[in-house]
Amino acid sequence: MAKSIPSAGLRLRLRLRRNARRRSRKSTRKIPKGVIHVQASFHNTIVTVTDVRGRVISWSSAGTCGFKSTRKGTPFAAQTAAGDAIRPVVDQGMQRAEVRIKGPGLGRDAALRAIRRSGIRLSCIRDVTPLPHNGCRPPKKRRV
């Protein structure tokens, strides 16, 4: 017996129903604990929220929040980016988090303040800025 081919309208409805199912399953995932990574450079601040295994749940940066050029490096931009990255995970039920801050930028403290204000309990705040152990050889001294 041959199957009948569904009409275009029916195919579209089936596809939409399948996509709706996928989306709803992803948003209902509860994440009780996570890790918040703050990368603060002099020119931008990037905030990434992951679960304990390291899978990215949400991220934001000063650039994606609408700040351009030199304003991306400001503390206010970092605060906005942190709030923007944390809002979806608070809705998903995150209660505790560990914060890892990397970089020398101005947005370090502002992002941390925004994270504290969000209502997530912080279990640990760790500075993971890479430091050289006498890294590369400096250029030779300039003779004038």
Curated annotation (Swiss-Prot):
Biological process annotations from GO: translation
Keyword list, A-Z: Chloroplast, Plastid, Ribonucleoprotein, Ribosomal protein, RNA-binding, rRNA-binding
Entry-linked InterPro entries: Ribosomal_uS11, Ribosomal_uS11_bac-type, Ribosomal_uS11_CS, Ribosomal_uS11_sf
A molecular function (GO) term: structural constituent of ribosome
Keyword Phosphoprotein belongs to the record: no
UniProt family annotation: Belongs to the universal ribosomal protein uS11 family.
Name by which UniProt lists this protein: Small ribosomal subunit protein uS11c
Protein source organism: Oenothera argillicola (Appalachian evening primrose)
Organism taxonomic ancestry: Eukaryota, Viridiplantae, Streptophyta, Embryophyta, Tracheophyta
